[in-house]
Amino acid sequence: MAKQVVFDREAREALEKGITKLTEAVRVTLGPRGRNVVLEKKFGAPTITNDGVTIAKEVELEDPLENVGALLVREVASKTNDVAGDGTTTACVLAQAIVREGMKNVAAGANPMFMKRGIEKAVAAVVENLKAQARPVETKDSISQVASISANDPQIGALVADAMEKVGKDGVITVEESKGMETAVDVVEGMQFDRGYISPYMVTDNERMEAVLEEPYILITDKKITAVADLVPVLERVVRTGKPLLIICEDMEGEALATLVVNKIRGTFTCVAVKAPAFGDRRKAMLQDIAILTGGQVITEEAGLKLENTTLDMLGQARQVRVGKEETTIVEGRGKEEAIEARIAQIRREYEESTSDYDREKLQERLAKLAGGVAVIKVGAATETEMKEKKMRIEDALAATRAAVEEGIVPGGGTALVRAQTALDGVQAQGDELTGVRLVYRALEEPMRQIAANAGVDGSVVVEKVRQSGDSMGFNAATREYVNLFEAGIVDPLKVTRSALENAASIASLVLTTESLIADIPEEEPPVPGGGMPPM
């Protein structure tokens, strides 16, 4: 396909137009009085959202040169979303502000490479200032405030804070669609994995079709059990104690399964067998997690252990085990606290060193099962469109809350960025480098200006008033009043604000240093031929 090549001012102007078009679509959503954007779908109902990255991903411009600019801002939004999970609209607004002011200076003859260095120096100074402004998040109220601001809904804030309190900062919180109208939090206590009983004859509660074992012994092995002779020694030892037995194994069939089922039906002995969770190396790791949680050992020939030689002290124990058709939950494992803590520390190290998103997600799940638990927020709404919009806001709120717990919070409403302007006074720069610093200085006001504009107030007036007021004072766009932002609960996670600025400055610097642009020449679609026979 043939390419078109444009240079100099024409290239930069095309990029700026694309950036502006995408940012104009996104910026209307910023702040508590921000509006929604409707996204048309090829199939099904349209999506209504105020999530910056979701809107950015939908924008594709007709002009291929302008579309390159839009793609660059989309990259800003996506990167910020990946790192912090929120702040995507702020990132787009900051990027556009730096590009807009920078283009004027490049057109006036400023050197873009020196401006880029100035931008980098300014961003480093601002980030240090933001860190100094940050406060740690320690209370449930603080978590609720962060989530409420992100989702623009106090009810969602309370839900997220409730879920966080129940499972702890290492817990996993997932968001699912509910079948009803209510939005609620369900917490799974203990360790749960997605494997149920091997045979339905093993259930102890026929009405609910689940097996509930009180104070059971737990046999954990990676072996497939078919011969009953392998199990007899350990079964005899467990029967003497009068306690039930849970067997976690690769699979069970043949006479071993038949023997357990017959004994259960006769009422001689209660034993439930479930398949081991996951596959391959992840299965070995999860079996080891279960063993440490319950104070047992994994009976594996790799470690020189055989089923027929298993003793009671090799078995795990728990207060209760519930086994359903598709999941097993171990409640209050009897493992040693120090062993569990050591395992948690090991998984956390693996999580920090892992580069794969999938592996990190699975490690986070394992960490939650050992450390905290799993909470599920079930989202209810009157229509599917409303449910999807609400689900997106809850996911954003969750990401913002995790970011806040990680790095702390700063004053919200764009105030932290305006306060950070003072850090730029001490940046050592001259000439075009100083111009780059000034670009960032002006851009730091842009989120507050936009929040004020969306609330129907003059942005310049708001910025000036905030600049002259005390450290924690800022503009509450919801009530159009000037308040102490920490006391009013108007806060942003430091990680979100920092990531938005860093990613915006990175892309904006590259746009300003662009001197040529290469894009596809759109091909005209040939007309569709008419029906009938082709010509002879």
UniProtKB/Swiss-Prot annotation:
It catalyses: ATP + H2O + a folded polypeptide = ADP + phosphate + an unfolded polypeptide. InterPro entries: Chaperonin_Cpn60_CS, Cpn60/GroEL, Cpn60/GroEL/TCP-1, GroEL-like_apical_dom_sf, GROEL-like_equatorial_sf, TCP-1-like_intermed_sf. ATP binds at T29, L30, G31, P32, D86, G87, T88, T89, T90, G413, N476, A477, A478, D492. It comes from the Bacteria. Its EC number is 5.6.1.7. It is an enzyme of class 5 (isomerase). Pfam families: Cpn60_TCP1. GO terms for biological process: protein refolding. GO terms for molecular function: ATP binding; ATP-dependent protein folding chaperone; isomerase activity; unfolded protein binding. One of its GO terms (cellular component) is cytoplasm. It is found in: Cytoplasm. Its main location: cytoplasm. Keywords: ATP-binding, Chaperone, Cytoplasm, Isomerase, Nucleotide-binding. HAMAP family: CH60 (MF_00600). Together with its co-chaperonin GroES, plays an essential role in assisting protein folding. The GroEL-GroES system forms a nano-cage that allows encapsulation of the non-native substrate proteins and provides a physical environment optimized to promote and accelerate protein folding. Forms a cylinder of 14 subunits composed of two heptameric rings stacked back-to-back. Interacts with the co-chaperonin GroES. Belongs to the chaperonin (HSP60) family. This is Chaperonin GroEL 2.
